[in-house]
Amino acid sequence: MDSALVLFAFLFHCLNVATAAPVNPELQEMKSNVIDIAKELSLRLESIIQTSIGPKFSPPSDELNGLSSIMAVLDECTNQISDNFDEAKKIKVDISSLMDSMSEWSDKHCGEQPSTQAENQTSRRFSITESMQAVTRLKHFLLLLQNNSDQLEIC
């Protein structure tokens, strides 16, 4: 009886594996690139947060609702980080790399994406404080993205 049950479980597993949908190599490459960059950027942001002097911020709870919402949050965080903030250039380059990977995929496989509006940084009064809030938000958002990378498949 036990061997029949084991055989049934094995055959059921083989059937599931054999009937699985084929994996899109472009999608897997984009997801892999995004996750790798997100991990590297998360570590850099964690270092910035740990060494910062000043108030600690709790991030807003962003939700992942597909590729366009992910790109919108990343764009918003980029706009909130002041160019005067330490390591802003490195952070923005990494975010740009993330967005380029997602944008390339989106251009090929999704419809037209809504445009995002850049905010003018010259009118900011508390740019360093706002930058720290954006860094904290971005770090938590990247962790959420790494844990929910399937959202990258949704246009």
Curated annotation (Swiss-Prot):
Compartments in which it is found: Secreted
Residue stretches in coiled coil: none
Keywords of this entry: Disulfide bond, Obesity, Secreted, Signal
InterPro entries: 4_helix_cytokine-like_core
The keyword Disulfide bond appears for this protein: yes
Cellular component GO terms, alphabetical: extracellular region
Function: May function as part of a signaling pathway that acts to regulate the size of the body fat depot.
Protein name: Leptin-A
Species per Swiss-Prot/TrEMBL record: Oryzias latipes
Organism lineage string: Eukaryota, Metazoa, Chordata, Craniata, Vertebrata
